[in-house]
Each structure stands twice: as C-alpha cells, then as structure tokens.
C-alpha cells in the first residue's frame, strides 16, 4: 500500500478471499474497479473489510442451517444465493403436511430414485391433484416410463398389485387408467376394446383345452397389460391349431351371411374380415392388442391372410371398392355380402377339370356349379403371390390358365422361330414369367407359343450372361454390352435411370461399369492392366542354352519431345536424320547400327529411336519391350517432363537398365544437378550421389561426352551378358510396317534370336510371306541378318501390326494355316467392334440425328496409324462421334475415294501419297482429302471439324449499365429518364431492371430517345429516355442492365 492506495489483489490476500469474490463485493458497494490490479482508497478498503466480515458471518450461519459442505472460496456468493432458497423449504414442508401421496404411491418408487431430495419433493407437487384422477395423472405416468423404455413390460407386470391397492375408491376404473397411461397410443381404441370383451369369454371354450387355459390367462392380464407383445403371443398360439384345422373354418364362413347377430358377429366375422382387419391390426400394432386382446379376431388371421391376398387377385377391379369400404369400418355387417361377391368370381381357378376347350356357355355353367364349393376350395388361391396387378383381370381365363402351365413345361424342347422384335420384351418379363404364365394362355395357341418362345429366349440370355467379368480399364457402352452379354440399350437405360445420359460410343470409367454390373447382378472384377512394355515371351529358349553366343546390345533412346533424342543419335551416327523428319519431330521408330571401338575391339550397338510425342505411347512401350538398355534423354534446361516419366515407367516395367543422358549442357540455362534431383523422385539416383544409375552429361550438338556415353552403354551390356543362338531359325519383333506403292508390304524386323536369310518363310502376326529381300538401315541389301540386327523385309502378303512377333517356319503349309487363323480372328474382332446393330440405330433415332464425322485414315506406317487412332479416341464424343471407316497403312487409292463418296467421309492422309488416278477421282467425286505430315496439325484439324458439327451455344454478352434518375408520366404509361453509367444502351436490346439488388423485370428495350429524337444507341456519360411497352413501374434509382445474346462456338476438351 502506497500513498493511501490499496490494490484489490493485496486486499484479497489480507481477507483470504478470491479476487472474483472481492470484485463482487465492490460491485455491491458501488466501488468502481476494473480488475484485480485496480487501486482503491483506504476508506473504500475499510468498507470492503466490513462487508466481507458480515458476509463471512452470514455464510457460517447459512452453512449450519443447510448442513452442506462447500468450498471456502465459493461461500460468500453461495451465502447470498441461499437466502431466497429458504422459502422453497417452507413450501416443501407445507406439501408434506397434507400427505396426498396415497393415490400416487405408484409414483413413489419412481420419485425416490432421484438423487436430490429437493427435486423429488418438487416433483411430488403435481401428484397432489391426482384425486380427481383425470388430468395430472396422465402427464405424470407416461413421464416415468419414457426414460427406461425397455422396462415397460416389467413395469406393467408390477403395476397390477399397485392397482389392487388403489382399487378402494374406484375398483373398476383404476386398472384401466394404469393400463392406458403407460402406452399413450392405446388410449383412443378403448371403446373398441370394450365391445369385443363380451364375446371373448364365449369363443375360447369352443376351442381346444389349451386355448381355454390361454384365454383365462388373457382375461387376468387383459386390462392391465395393453402392450403389443402379449396379445400378439396369444394370437400366434391360437393360430397354430386353426391352420391345422381348416375344415372348421369352412362351415363357419358359410354361416356368416345368415347369422349376423351383433354379439356373435365378432367371432364369426373373423373369417371373412381378415382382408380389411389385417391391415389395420398390422398398421397400428400398439392399439390392436387393446382391441383384440381377447384373441377372437386374430385367431383366423393366418389363413385369412392368404385369403385376403387372394381376394383382390382373383376378382375384377370393381371389388376393390368393396375392400376399401371394408377397411373403413371394421365390424360393419353389410360389408360381408360384398365379400361373398368378391369370392364368387375366383372359384373357376380351382375347377381344373379338362374343360379348357369347351365353349364359353359351358364355362359359365361350370362357374355356377362351382359357386357351391367356393368355401371348400378357397385355400387354392393361397398359391398365388402378391402380384395383384398381373392377375386383376383373370376372370374368364382361369381354367385354361392352369392347363397352360403344363403346356409350358412340355413345350420348351420345341421352340418356334424367334422374333427379334420380342427380345426387349423378354428381358422385361423376366420376373413375372413363372407366375404370370397362366395369364397369357387365354384362348389361342399362338399366344402360348409366343410366351413359350419368350421364356426360351430369356433362358438363353440368362445362360449366356456371365456371373463374373474381369476388366482392365474403361470400356465403351458397346464394348461393355459385349462383355456383359446384354443389349447396349439396357446399359444406356440403367445409367439414364441413375441420372447419367450416355451414348453408345462413350467411354465408361471403372466405377460406372461396376455400378452397371451391380444392377445386372454381375460381379465386376478390376485387374490392373499389364504394362505394355512388359516382355511377353522369352526369345531364347531352353534348347538354345548350349549354342549361345554374345550379341550386340539393342539400345532404345527415350525421352520427352524436343529433348534432343534424334539429334543425339545423329551425332553418334554422324548423319542428319533429324533434318529429314517432318516438323523436326520423330514419328517412327528408327533402327540404326553404330560401330564402336571399345578396348581395341570393334563392337556394334543397335539403336532404336522412339518418338517423344504423347500420341506415340505404344511405340515407346514397344521400343522398351524389345530393348536391352534404355537411354533416357533429359534436357538440362527443361528437366523431367510427362513423357520422361512415362519412359521411365516403360523401362522399369520391361525390367531393362536405364542410362540417363543429360543433354543440352551447352545451353545457358542448363542445370544438370537439378535434373539429377528431379530424377531421384522416380527411383533414379546418380552414381556420384550414391545410387546405381549411370548419368552422363552430354551435348548432342557439340558432340561432348558421347564417347563416355557409348562406353557406359557397352559396360552395362557386358554386365547383362547378352546372348543368342545364331544357328537356329529367326524369331523377333516387328518394329514398324508400312505399305510401299512400289515394294508392297514392308516391315522393319528386329531379330532377337536366330538368323534370318533371304528365302525364309515367316509369319508376322496375321501376315504370311517369303523373304525376297532385306535392306539394312543405310539402304544396303543384305542376305543374312544375325541377332540384334534390324532390317527391312520385302515379300509379306499383308502389312503386319507394329509390335507383332514373327517366326520363321520350315513348313509353308503350317505357316499359311497359322496366318489364316490369325487373320480370321482379327477380322471377326474388327467386325464386332464396327458393327451397327438395330438397337444402336434405334437409340440414335431416339436421340435425334446423331452427328458423326466419318473418317478414312491412311498412314505411311502401321505405328503412325495406331498412334493417330489412339489420340482420336481421347477426344470426347458425347455429342459428336468419330466413325473410323478404315484405318490402315498405304497410299490413298481409288477404292478409298469410292468408299468416302458413298459414306460421306473425309480422307486423312498422313505422310502418304496418292495412287495413280486417285487424286483425279477425288476431284470428280468431291471427296475432301486432307494431307498431313505432322500429327499435331492433324489432331487440331479433326478437333476443329468436330467442334464445327456442334450446335453453337447462346451466350449473354453485357452491353452496359444505366441508372434511372427521373420518371415522367406519358399518357397511360411512364418514361424513365436515365443516365448511362457504363457501356452503352442499344434500342431493341434485352434489358434487366434491378431494384434493390433484385430483378423485377426482364424484357426488350422498345423505345430509346435522346433529346426527344429516336436514338439507335446511347453511350456512357449521356442521358436518355427509356420506354417499355410492358413495364411502366419505374422508380428513381432503378438500374437497367442491357445485354445481348450472341452465338459462341462450342469447344471440345481432350480427355486424359
């Protein structure tokens, strides 16, 4: 304390109080303080000390009265709060004096469960009025069981003795009240439950002795136990003998129309009434036991249940009204004759005699005779299921229908000619055929045959449909229909119902395919697609092990586009291949030989140069599959790019060692260390960084470090111990293939094992041929091609596919048969892919005119055609589709022109030429022929053509914004005096009037004037008058937004 000032926290220590309590005392004394560190004067501190002492004294006295323990810090505030609590105690004491708890003794155990005595006594206040026994008891009773719901059964069992204690004032009402108060839902049906109680006692004696005992138990616990469980148990026990004793039911049903006395009715009406009563009992289970606790109505419920199900099935629609009336009044007597009418039309079903070929008059007589035995044969319709809608109109067809079942069993071995039009119906009728087969066979044999055929077709489709399919990736709707053996329209329908509108040629992803399979109950298993670069067959077999010799390594140069792969190969070969490539990019696989002197010995390396463009993925994978070593070229100034990553994955999938050539180190922005860092993310760590990957910085243009690169390649080849058997017939892979107008089919073959000679008979894929000539990479003719050499082969009958494996055969007949078998398989698969079915045509007709672009693609080599077709598949084809009529290697011929003219197609030529007379034929037929030598340009033009087929979309283009500053009444309407804030206002443009941020009108600007003269448009910064025919409710401050609708060409985005 200094200068007569005291801090709050010092005072709290002195008084042994909390800061909060001291601040509360300051508030009571109106002493202005902000926090515990505030200072007060000595006089104010003295006042606080006095108040604190008084507060402590009152606190002690309050503790003595209450006898409760509390913490010292909280005592002052609690003491203040306990003062108003005293009157509460007095009220509680006053409540105890009258002791009105006699009627509420049942509540006492529940109330005593509460922990706090004060709360329990306060809860006892409401039961004081329960003497009237009406209003307070009902809120009080349900409140207790709502907490422990499962205890309701035990509580109801404990309650009867309680009610016995309370029965002195009202012996008859007390048990009903206790029972009704527990479940509130039972209260409304009380009047109904009282009526059947009288017949209750009459019915059980008519039943077996076991039922009498159960009925007595039911009577004892009938009124207090109003739950849904016990009456249901009684009902089940009584139902069992009733089901077994069906003969007893039948005569009672017959008595019903005659005996309709109100007292005996409840017991006998139970037979016909189950149809309406059953739904009501099931609908509100809690109330049903109170009504039917006696066991009278539920007793025939089980047999009646099936009768109820059969009644609407076997009767015409008019009987539905009878059922509706029945459901409205449960015990109404006039409804029972309706039920008899309901039963009468159905007996023809049991009258099964051999009368199906008799005329209608005789059938009517049979029906009349059958009416006498309606009740006896009422059980037969139980066989019918709940398919009411299938059999609602089966009045006259019943007797032939039963014989139809036997015919359907006999006929399937003799199917009639199938009708394709009925196929969709077969799939739709899959579920009801077995049950609904009685309905179609009405009067003519043709109907029966039709349905037999339908069932036969359905059985065939079910047999063909697989239970489990395996997919490796996305499929088109058409491909998926082949895999699942269902019509493609069925798949489109399933997806449409799921909210996805798809076309026949649209690609479906794996989750969507799984969804379709789930709907069709076909298990779809997804298997990871095998890497294209994986080596499928081992060229060197066990029989070659004794004759192996060292062979040159096959090295594939891979990497991103424009990273210098071909330039690097040029520098090694001392040639200019890159200059000859169109657009400066490689679009083929090139195979080249390089002679290298290593350790004083001449050695050879075979290089395969692969394209880096993304469209040539298959080519890169093919290169990795046949290679021994992969040289990954990465530009030092560009780093790792998408195709670099893809090349790494191809090489790793093929299991070949990777040598990294970091190119363009002579450029200014070169960062070889950054390239090494990026490559470590893909498992390639440089040797100088402690890894195993050889990385050589090179400059292709200057020729730096090329010798080091070649030396490293030969070292890796030595470690791999590459060998082959040169003394056997040749085996290998087709690197590239094309059709030459002078030479015919030409294929570049890489021999991986054995030796190829001129005159050998070989099969490459589906192409058969005899080697007429071989040319090496420098254009020289050779007679022998040893392992690891790449040569161009002439003499094949057809152009093989790039990536096919070839093999030399000694027997020409064997080779021809193998080639023809493969050709047949390819032709069949091609037909399946390109087929146009009636279902697809009908689907296209439903969608409207389907826009499609017909293309004929001719390329120089098979690999380029494959790459272009793969790239075109990436273009989305939801609204516009590409229809590839022909895609092959070779020059453009007159046959291609004729096909294009007939199908209105565009011919795309890629690095190819015209055959003689083809160009003139194209001009005469008006066929559009486009020639390309760079794949970029080809893909761009095709995408532009597809976008041109799309309907242009209307886009809103804003023109300006105008503010209304004055309103002038003119005649009946009004004119807005406006100021153009931005843009411009154009007459007859579309406008939107906003007021307070909300659009109040949209329309057309009819009148625009400036200085009392009509104006075509008014620019920003000028004033004008605006008038509209349909809008005159102008207010100053309104904003007019002007805009116009313009057509915009739609674009397609390439899917990845």
Curated annotation (Swiss-Prot):
PROSITE patterns: G_TR_2, IF2. Coiled coil: none annotated. The keyword Nucleotide-binding applies. This is Translation initiation factor IF-2. One of its GO terms (molecular function) is translation initiation factor activity. GO terms for cellular component: cytosol. Residues 550-723 form the tr-type G domain. Keywords: Cytoplasm, GTP-binding, Initiation factor, Nucleotide-binding, Protein biosynthesis. Residues 109-120, 151-173 have a biased composition (Polar residues). It comes from the Bacteria. GTP binds at residues 559-566, 609-613, 663-666. PANTHER family: TR-TYPE G DOMAIN-CONTAINING PROTEIN, TRANSLATION INITIATION FACTOR IF-2-RELATED. InterPro entries: EF-G-like_DII (IPR053905), IF2_II (IPR044145), IF2_N (IPR006847), P-loop_NTPase (IPR027417), Small_GTP-bd (IPR005225), T_Tr_GTP-bd_dom (IPR000795), TF_IF2_bacterial-like (IPR000178), TIF_IF2 (IPR015760). Pfam families: EF-G_D2 (PF22042), GTP_EFTU (PF00009), IF-2 (PF11987), IF2_N (PF04760). Belongs to the TRAFAC class translation factor GTPase superfamily. Classic translation factor GTPase family. IF-2 subfamily. Residues 182-197, 231-250, 446-468 have a biased composition (Basic and acidic residues). One of the essential components for the initiation of protein synthesis. Protects formylmethionyl-tRNA from spontaneous hydrolysis and promotes its binding to the 30S ribosomal subunits. Also involved in the hydrolysis of GTP during the formation of the 70S ribosomal complex. Residues 60-88, 109-359, 406-472 are annotated as: Disordered.
């Amino acid at each position: 304390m200094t200068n007569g000032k005291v801090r709050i926290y010092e005072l709290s220590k002195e008084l042994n109080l909390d800061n909060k309590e001291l601040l509360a005392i300051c508030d009571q004394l109106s002493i202005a303080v902000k926090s515990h560190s505030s200072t007060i004067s000595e006089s104010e501190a003295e006042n606080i000390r006095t108040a604190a002492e008084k507060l402590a004294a009152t606190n002690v006295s309050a503790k003595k009265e209450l006898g409760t323990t509390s913490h010292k810090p909280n005592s002052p505030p609690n003491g203040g709060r306990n003062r108003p609590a005293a009157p509460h105690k007095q009220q509680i004491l006053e409540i105890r004096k009258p002791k009105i708890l006699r009627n509420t003794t049942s509540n006492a155990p529940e109330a005593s469960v509460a922990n706090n005595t004060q709360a329990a006594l306060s809860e006892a206040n409401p039961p004081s009025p329960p003497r009237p026994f009406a209003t307070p008891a009902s809120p009080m009773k349900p409140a207790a069981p709502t907490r422990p719901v499962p205890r309701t059964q035990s509580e109801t069992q404990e309650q009867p003795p309680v009610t016995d204690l309370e029965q002195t004032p009202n012996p008859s009402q007390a048990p009903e009240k206790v029972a009704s108060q527990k479940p509130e839902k039972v209260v409304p049906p009380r009047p109904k439950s009282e009526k059947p109680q009288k017949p209750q006692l009459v019915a059980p004696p008519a039943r077996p002795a076991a039922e009498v005992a159960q009925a007595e138990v039911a009577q004892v616990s009938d009124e207090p136990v109003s739950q849904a469980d016990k009456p249901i148990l009684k009902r089940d026990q009584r139902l069992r003998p009733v089901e077994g004793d069906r003969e007893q039911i039948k005569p009672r049903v017959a008595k019903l129309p005659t005996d309709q006395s109100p007292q005996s009715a409840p017991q006998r009406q139970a037979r016909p009434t189950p149809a309406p009563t059953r739904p009501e009992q099931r609908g509100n289970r809690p109330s049903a036991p109170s009504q039917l606790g006696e066991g009278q109505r539920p007793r025939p419920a089980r047999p009646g249940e099936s009768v109820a199900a059969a009644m609407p099935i076997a009767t015409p629609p008019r009987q539905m009204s009878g059922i509706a009336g029945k459901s409205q009044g449960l015990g109404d007597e006039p409804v029972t004759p309706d039920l008899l009418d309901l039963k009468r039309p159905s007996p023809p079903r049991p009258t099964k005699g051999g009368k199906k070929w008799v005329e209608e008059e005789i059938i009517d007589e049979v029906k009349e005779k059958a009416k006498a035995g309606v009740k006896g044969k009422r059980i037969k319709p139980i066989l019918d299921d709940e398919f009411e809608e299938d059999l609602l109109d089966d009045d006259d067809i019943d007797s032939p229908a039963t014989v139809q079942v036997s015919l359907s069993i006999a006929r399937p071995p003799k199917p009639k000619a199938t009708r394709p039009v009925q196929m969709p119906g077969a799939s739709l009728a899959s579920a009801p055929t077995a049950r609904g087969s009685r309905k179609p066979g009405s009067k003519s044999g043709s109907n029966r045959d039709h349905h037999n055929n339908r069932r036969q077709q359905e059985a065939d489709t079910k047999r063909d449909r697989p239970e489990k399919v395996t997919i490796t990736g996305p499929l088109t709707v058409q491909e998926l229909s082949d895999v699942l053996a269902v019509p493609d329209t069925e798949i489109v329908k399933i997806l449409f119902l799921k909210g996805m509108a798809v076309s026949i040629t649209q690609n479906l992803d794996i989750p969507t395919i799984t969804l379709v399979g789930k709907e069709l109950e076909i298990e779809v298993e997804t298997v990871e697609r095998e890497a294209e670069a994986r080596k499928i067959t081992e060229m060197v077999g066990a029989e070659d092990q004794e004759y192996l010799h060292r062979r040159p390594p096959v090295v594939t140069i891979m990497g991103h586009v424009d990273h210098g792969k071909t330039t690097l190969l040029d520098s090694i070969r001392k040639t200019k291949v890159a200059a000859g490539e169109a657009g400066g990019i490689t679009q083929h696989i090139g195979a080249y030989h390089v002679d290298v002197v290593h350790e004083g010995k001449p050695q050879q390396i075979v290089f395969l140069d692969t394209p880096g463009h993304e469209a040539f993925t298959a080519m890169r994978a093919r290169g990795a599959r046949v290679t021994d070593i992969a040289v990954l070229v990465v530009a030092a100034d560009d780093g790792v790019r998408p195709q670099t990553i893809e090349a790494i994955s191809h090489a790793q999938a093929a299991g070949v060692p990777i040598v990294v050539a970091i190119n363009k180190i002579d450029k200014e922005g070169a960062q070889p260390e950054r390239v090494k860092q990026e490559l470590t993310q893909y498992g390639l760590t440089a040797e100088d960084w402690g890894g195993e990957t050889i990385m050589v910085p090179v400059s292709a243009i200057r020729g730096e470090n090329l010798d080091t690169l070649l030396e490293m390649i030969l070292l890796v080849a030595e470690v791999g111990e590459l060998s082959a058997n040169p003394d056997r017939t040749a085996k290998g892979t087709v690197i590239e293939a094309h059709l030459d107008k002078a030479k015919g089919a030409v294929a570049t073959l890489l021999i991986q094992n054995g030796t190829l000679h001129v005159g050998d008979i070989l099969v490459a894929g589906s192409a058969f041929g005899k080697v007429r000539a071989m040319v090496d990479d420098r254009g020289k003719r050779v007679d022998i091609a040893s392992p690891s050499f790449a040569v161009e082969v002439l003499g094949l009958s057809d152009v093989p596919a790039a990536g096919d494996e070839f093999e030399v055969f000694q027997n020409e007949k064997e080779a021809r048969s193998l080639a023809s078998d493969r050709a047949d398989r390819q032709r069949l698969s091609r037909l399946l892919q390109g087929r146009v079915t009636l279902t697809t045509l009908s689907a296209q007709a439903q969608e409207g005119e389907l826009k499609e672009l017909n293309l004929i693609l001719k390329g120089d080599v098979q690999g380029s055609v494959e790459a272009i077709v793969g790239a075109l598949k990436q273009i989305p084809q939801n609204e516009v589709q590409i229809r590839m009529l022909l895609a092959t290697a070779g020059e453009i011929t007159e046959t291609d022109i004729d096909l294009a003219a007939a199908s209105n197609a565009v011919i795309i030529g890629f690095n190819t030429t015209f055959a003689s007379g083809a160009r003139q034929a194209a001009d005469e037929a008006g066929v559009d022929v486009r020639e390309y030598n760079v794949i970029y340009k080809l893909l761009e033009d095709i995408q532009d053509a597809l976008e041109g087929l799309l309907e242009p979309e209307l886009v809103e283009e804003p023109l300006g914004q105008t503010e209304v500053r004055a309103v002038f009444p003119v005649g009946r309407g009004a004119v807005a005096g406006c100021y153009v804030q931005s843009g411009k206002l154009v007459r007859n443009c579309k406008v939107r009037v906003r007021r307070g941020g909300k659009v109040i009108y949209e329309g057309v600007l009819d009148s625009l004037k400036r200085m009392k003269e009509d104006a075509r448009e008014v620019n920003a910064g000028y004033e004008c008058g605006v008038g509209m025919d349909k809008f005159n409710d102008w207010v100053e401050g309104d904003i007019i937004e002007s805009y116009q609708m313009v057509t915009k060409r739609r674009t397609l985005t390439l899917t990845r």
